């Protein structure tokens, strides 16, 4: 509905994550005015080492004012679960300046898939004067080709600064040596 109302709707999906989704599904979205791109399409027989360079981000930005980020996939089975697979996940709603960082992460990925550099100020509206809090938020991203281990460095810093406790939860616990050292 929103694309038909003139709202700019952009979608990046991971080609491997949507392996079983037929191309016609995305074509119908494009026909409805949604700008849709696959992140690093995998085509056979060109199966290379880059097949594992996937986009695992789950984020959404609305009008540059509200952002959602976390672990929830967009599919009914992740909302309702089923008898064989129940899901527990965390997703955050963010308002204020932190939304700019979520949007920046999306627009960097957008440049990667579309080669369109989106820099217009309309995408970064002024933060509402009604948002008053003392919260700090930092959005940290990673990439398999980035020389900067930002997330790992963030974990190390958090662990080293802890004074009373640290809670960590992850489905994939494959820590680097610096993270293990900091945990000890």
Q: Each predicted region: which residue ranges?
A:
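Charged, low-complexity intrinsically disordered terminal segments
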Residues: 1-184
């Amino acid at each position: 509905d929103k694309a038909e109302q003139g709202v700019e709707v952009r979608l990046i999906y991971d080609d491997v994550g949507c392996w079983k989704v037929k191309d016609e599904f995305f074509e119908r979205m494009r026909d409805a005015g949604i700008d849709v791109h696959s992140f690093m399409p995998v085509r056979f027989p060109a199966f290379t080492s880059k097949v594992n360079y996937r986009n695992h981000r789950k984020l959404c930005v609305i009008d540059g004012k509200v952002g959602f980020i976390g672990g929830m996939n967009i599919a009914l089975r992740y909302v309702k679960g089923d008898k064989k697979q129940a899901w527990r996940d965390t997703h955050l709603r963010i308002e204020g300046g932190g939304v700019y960082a979520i949007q920046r992460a999306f627009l960097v990925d957008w440049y990667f898939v579309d080669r369109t550099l989106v820099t217009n100020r309309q995408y970064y509206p002024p933060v509402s004067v009604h948002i008053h809090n003392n919260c700090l938020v930092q959005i940290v991203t990673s990439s398999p080709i980035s020389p900067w281990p930002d997330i790992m460095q963030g974990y190390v810093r958090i662990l080293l600064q802890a004074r009373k406790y640290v809670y960590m939860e992850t489905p994939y616990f494959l820590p680097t040596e610096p993270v293990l050292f900091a945990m000890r």
